[in-house]
């Protein structure tokens, strides 16, 4: 087992070398000059230190906004008014050798590629209609090869590109989501893995959502849907009216390290298509992508690395030059105009031993070499990453006490025009240094001598120009540990801001993730940013060989003390810590192990619930107002709730989303077909397609279902697809009443039919949904329901009056009275007044059930 110490403290000591903007951002965001469809399909990319954003265009133009920090944007400017680009769907831009290439599908009628000499245009059409449906996305791989991805009838398609204007034959690389329309691919590469965001099923549906797939084999094959995480971005419950999340782009933030996903949300459904801009952080637990969103409350602004844009006239005292002729030109870039010298310009800003740095370079002379300086102490001790334009290589060298040693020489793949602007990116962690040119990994060297120092630029026997330069003490995702992580969300345990634990590697199908090895006396501390002042539930995903005890502190106050985490026989399990009170905004949460030891993998932080009242509905005349989400046709007939075919209905408002442990039960009877049951721990329900199709949306939810068919009982998990957990043979018939009950406590589910003393199914889910609403679901059958009762298992009773008979008389003969947990407390009703306050089930001789309150 590979173990290494977590070194956060050293990074935090370096934090003053970067600056932040205090205002932050809050989703969704409005922009000046939004078009008729708002900020649909936002694409953001970075060029020479500036971010450029493009969205779906209107009838005559495509707009572009600009920012240096992803929060403060200027514009828009019209970047394209070419007649071919009317209603330009999802425009995306790539920079390559001095040209900007925009790919778009005007009105969804096939793709065109337009070109420009500037990211702000004007873009003009350079191709005929290239077809390939909609939502084109381009990846340039490390070997310089280009790939084109787009939506198709069978899912996401991939095509090789022989040049920036030519698209080859397509291949299906990701199947359609749920067999329905799938779109919006966004592919990027990190640490030799290919990550793809994609979305569906209909952009006008509130259930429009984002999935992720990962490939370790290549850009045209091997993409594996991450079912454990999908949908990775979804919101349909109505919290802050955020719906329809998808079609975004990935960009590295101004700290040079943190990834961000920029996407849109749907404001209106039906005929409307107005969308707004949203942005959330991506975290990395090893190779595992963690989506810290969606958020609707204020997030801290991205950290901005120490930088220089040379947008002035004088170089200034913050720079030191040696030899050559250095000066700022056009308030835009630094130029070195003496081709005879070996010269350097370094920025007097201390750089950490672990760092990320970005440079922008362009050759103006001939021959020689030019590039980046790092770890500069003085003129006799420094490291360089120099481009040799004649050989089309980048050479990494270390000079110590005046003696230069070549550490590595790597080819710059693909077509390379040195007279155009190019970027160099360095990532140094411990003694390992990665070098990228134009975001393509060229190679990795060992540079043990480079510890700290300055960054800058250098020329050798040539002239060159140099643009935006920046450096950050963060590398390989380390910046996120100091971030106030949003709650609710799923937190990686490894994203602790402070811990004295070690890491252990967790194998994934495509790489590795990390868990914390917490022994007695160890702790893990997290900066968290809570949506609101309320209670939260924390599902700890852990494993242990023996029982362990933990406590939880928030802002140094104990909120959970000495809770036992049962032994898991070293397999992963989840234990939910309930009702942790958090103030809205920033807090510090600390988990301490008191006894034993655990490996802590993730923390599923969800909004809790303060509901303790029993919720009931007898459907005497109408449907209770407690039912807040209805799909399909639901009516009350003769005191029964009826669904004629497909549908689902959920009890409780958004305040019920945090309910964890409870008993839910009801009576059921069927028409000619049998296929219906109880939903529980449900979140994010939606209907299918633009027309809110109840049949298509039958499985569009996250939660559990316990149901009856004519020949079985079945327990399943629905995560916008269906996964059967347990099925047992049993016979159920039309026009007979059955009493069905589910009891869910922690990650254990017990399911009953008629016999309330013996569950037909007992199941423990190692990775459960920890909270959610309850409801009913029917699938292609006429089903009726009565005497619906939801009882929170909180250890207290609230809002329950004294015992009384139901309004419908019930025969005293041959009946039994039961508690909701199935315990028989009386044979008949002669002594009903002596029963404690509560809710009871009366079983009559004809098999019907009535509720007593």
Model-identified regions with their sequence ranges:
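Bacterial Sec-dependent N-terminal signal peptides
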Residues: 1-23
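Intrinsically disordered, low-complexity repeat and linker tracts
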Residues: 20-21, 301, 608-612, 796-812
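Beta-rich carbohydrate-recognition and catalytic domains
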Residues: 22-182, 189-194, 198-239, 254-307, ...
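Generic structural signal for well-ordered beta-strand positions
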Residues: 126, 147, 292, 405, ...
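Aromatic sugar-binding interfaces of carbohydrate-active proteins
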Residues: 209-284, 437-464, 752-780
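Extracellular glycan-recognition regions
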Residues: 286-537, 542, 546-577, 583-586, ...
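Short acidic/polar inter-strand loop motif in beta-rich domains
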Residues: 595-599, 847
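C-terminal outer-membrane/trafficking sorting elements
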Residues: 797-853
């Amino acid at each position: 087992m590979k173990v290494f110490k977590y070194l956060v403290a050293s990074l935090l000591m370096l934090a003053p070398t970067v600056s932040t903007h205090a205002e932050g951002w809050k989703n969704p965001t409005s922009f000046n000059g939004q078009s008729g469809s708002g900020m649909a399909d936002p694409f953001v990319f970075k060029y020479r230190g500036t971010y450029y954003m493009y969205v779906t265009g209107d009838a005559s133009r495509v707009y572009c906004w600009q920012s240096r920090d992803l929060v403060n944007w200027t514009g828009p400017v019209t970047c394209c008014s070419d007649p071919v680009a009317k209603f330009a769907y999802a425009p995306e831009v790539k920079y390559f050798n001095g040209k900007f290439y925009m790919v778009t599908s005007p009105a969804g009628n096939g793709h065109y590629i337009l070109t420009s000499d500037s990211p702000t245009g004007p873009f003009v059409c350079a191709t005929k209609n290239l077809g390939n449906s909609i939502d084109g996305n381009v990846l340039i791989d490390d070997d310089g090869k280009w790939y084109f991805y787009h939506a198709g009838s069978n899912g996401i398609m991939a095509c090789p590109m022989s040049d920036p204007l030519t698209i080859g034959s397509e291949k299906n690389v990701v199947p359609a989501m749920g067999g329905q329309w799938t779109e919006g691919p966004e592919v990027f590469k990190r640490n030799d893995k290919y990550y793809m965001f994609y979305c569906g099923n209909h952009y006008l549906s509130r259930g429009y959502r984002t999935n992720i797939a990962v490939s370790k084999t290549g850009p045209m094959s091997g993409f594996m849907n991450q079912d454990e995480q999908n949908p990775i971005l979804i919101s349909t419950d109505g919290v802050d009216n955020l719906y329809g999340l998808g079609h975004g782009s990935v960009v590295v933030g101004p700290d040079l390290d943190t990834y961000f996903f920029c996407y849109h949300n749907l404001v209106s459904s039906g005929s409307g298509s107005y969308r707004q801009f949203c942005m959330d952080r991506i975290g990395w637990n090893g190779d595992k992508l963690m989506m810290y969103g969606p958020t609707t409350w204020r997030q801290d602004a991205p950290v901005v690395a120490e930088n220089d844009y040379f947008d002035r006239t004088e170089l200034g005292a913050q720079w030191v030059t040696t030899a050559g002729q250095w000066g700022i030109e056009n308030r835009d870039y630094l130029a070195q105009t003496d081709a005879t010298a070996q010269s350097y310009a370094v920025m007097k800003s201390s750089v950490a031993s672990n760092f990320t740095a970005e440079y922008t370079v362009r050759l103006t002379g001939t021959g020689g070499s030019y590039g980046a300086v790092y770890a500069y102490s003085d003129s006799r001790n420094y490291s360089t990453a120099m481009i040799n334009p004649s050989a089309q290589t980048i050479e990494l060298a270390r000079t110590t006490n005046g003696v230069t040693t070549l550490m590595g020489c790597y080819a710059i793949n693909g077509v390379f025009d040195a007279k155009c602007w190019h970027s160099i990116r360095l990532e140094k962690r411990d003694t390992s240094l990665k070098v990228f040119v134009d975001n393509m990994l060229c190679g990795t060297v060992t540079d043990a001598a480079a510890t700290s120092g300055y960054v800058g630029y250098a020329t050798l026997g040539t002239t060159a120009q140099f643009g935006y330069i920046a450096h950050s003490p963060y590398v390989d995702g380390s910046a996120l540990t100091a971030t106030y992580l949003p709650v609710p969300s799923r937190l990686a345990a490894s994203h602790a801001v402070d811990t004295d634990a070690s890491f252990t590697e967790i194998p994934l199908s495509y790489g590795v993730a990390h868990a914390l090895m917490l022994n007695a006396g160890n702790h893990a501390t997290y900066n968290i940013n809570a949506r609101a002042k309320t209670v939260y539930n924390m599902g700890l995903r852990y494993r242990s060989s023996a029982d362990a005890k933990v406590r939880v502190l928030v802002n140094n106050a104990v909120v959970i003390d000495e809770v036992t985490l049962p032994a898991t026989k070293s397999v992963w399990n989840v234990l939910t810590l309930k009702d942790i009170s958090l103030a809205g905004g920033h807090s510090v949460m600390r988990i301490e192990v008191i006894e034993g030891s655990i490996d802590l993998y993730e923390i599923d932080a969800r909004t809790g619930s303060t509901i303790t009242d029993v919720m009931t509905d007898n459907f005497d005349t109408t449907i209770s107002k407690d039912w807040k989400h209805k799909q399909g046709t639901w009516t009350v007939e003769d005191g029964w709730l009826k669904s004629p075919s497909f549908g689902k209905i959920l009890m409780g408002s958004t305040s019920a989303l945090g309910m964890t442990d409870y008993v839910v039960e009801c009576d059921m009877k069927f028409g000619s077909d049998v296929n219906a049951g109880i939903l529980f721990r449900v979140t994010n329900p939606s209907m299918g397609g633009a027309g809110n199709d109840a049949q298509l949306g039958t499985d569009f939810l996250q939660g559990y279902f316990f149901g009856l068919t004519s020949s079985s009982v079945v327990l399943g998990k629905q995560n916008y697809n269906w996964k059967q957990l347990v099925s047992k043979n049993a016979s159920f018939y039309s026009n007979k009443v059955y009493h069905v009950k589910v009891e869910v406590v922690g990650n254990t589910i017990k399911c009953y039919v008629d016999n309330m003393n013996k569950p037909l199914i007992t199941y423990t889910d190692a990775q459960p949904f920890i909270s959610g609403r309850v409801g009913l679901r029917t699938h292609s059958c006429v089903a009726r329901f009565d005497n619906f009762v939801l009882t929170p298992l909180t250890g207290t009773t609230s809002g329950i009056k004294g015992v009384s008979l139901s309004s419908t008389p019930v025969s005293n003969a041959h009946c039994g009275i039961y508690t909701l947990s199935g315990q028989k407390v009386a044979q008949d009703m002669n002594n009903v007044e002596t029963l404690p306050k509560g809710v009871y089930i009366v079983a009559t001789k004809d098999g019907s059930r009535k509720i007593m309150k």
